[in-house]
Amino acid sequence: MNSQIRQNFHQECEAAINRQVNMELYASYVYLSMSYYFDRDDVALKNFAKYFLHQSHEEREHAEKLMKMQNQRGGRLFLQDIKKPERDEWANGLEALECSLQLEKNVNQSILELHKLSTDHNDPHLCDFLESHYLDEQVKSMKELGDHITNLRRMGAPSNGLAEYLFDKHTLGEDHE
């Protein structure tokens, strides 16, 4: 059945949105894995766990916004299998944050490609949507992760376990309580 509201919404953009939904859900899944790793009794970094749980919820919300927009434009949502995170263990907080930064860069690159596609197909609605809800937020997220990585290294992580504990308690504790 064809949508009666669809206008100036190219099928390539529709398909790319479905792929972006999958990428956002994958990112949410990775952050969920990280959260519950740091919540384990043998890791016990509760603020890392809270931080990554918050990130997971944020990524899921990004996916939901895209799904809602897909429907508003008369597109069709086709969910795909969500890939399992590449790992189940995170050696330390620094490594998890470095993986998070790479994940955010990958998500950002995908959003930039979606923006280019929407520009190429002369779709100002999709361009505006991405600019309003995603592009600035991605840059801020990457900056925050970069700052966290720098500060953890400055404190002596990963070789200094106390650095990770203090970072968890003082930096993540005050940011995300």
Curated annotation (Swiss-Prot):
Q: Give the CDD domains listed for this entry.
A: Euk_Ferritin
Which Enzyme Commission numbers does its entry carry?
1.16.3.1
Q: What does this protein do?
A: Stores iron in a soluble, non-toxic, readily available form. Important for iron homeostasis. Has ferroxidase activity. Iron is taken up in the ferrous form and deposited as ferric hydroxides after oxidation.
Spell out the GO cellular component terms annotated for this protein, sorted alphabetically and separated by semicolons: cytoplasm
Q: Give residues annotated as binding Fe cation 2.
A: E59, E104, Q138
Which protein family is it in? Belongs to the ferritin family.
Other information: There are three types of ferritin subunits in amphibia: L, M and H chains. M and H chains are fast mineralizing; the L chain is very slow mineralizing.
Q: Does Oxidoreductase count among this protein's keywords?
A: yes
Catalytic activity, per the record?
4 Fe(2+) + O2 + 4 H(+) = 4 Fe(3+) + 2 H2O
Q: State the Gene Ontology terms under molecular function.
A: ferric iron binding; ferrous iron binding; ferroxidase activity
What PROSITE patterns would the database entry show?
A: FERRITIN_1, FERRITIN_2, FERRITIN_LIKE
**Main localisation, per the record?**
cytoplasm
- Which UniProt keywords are given for this protein, alphabetically ordered? Cytoplasm, Iron, Iron storage, Metal-binding, Oxidoreductase
GO BP: any one term: iron ion transport
Q: Does the keyword Membrane apply?
A: no
Q: How does it assemble?
A: Oligomer of 24 subunits. There are two types of subunits: L (light) chain and H (heavy) chain. The functional molecule is roughly spherical and contains a central cavity into which the insoluble mineral iron core is deposited.
Q: Can you say what this protein is called? A: Ferritin heavy chain, oocyte isoform
Q: Where in the cell is it found?
A: Cytoplasm
Stored InterPro entries: Ferritin, Ferritin-like, Ferritin-like_diiron, Ferritin-like_SF, Ferritin_CS, Ferritin_DPS_dom
Entry binding sites for Fe cation 1: E24, E59, H62
Q: Where is the Ferritin-like diiron domain positioned along the sequence?
A: 7-156
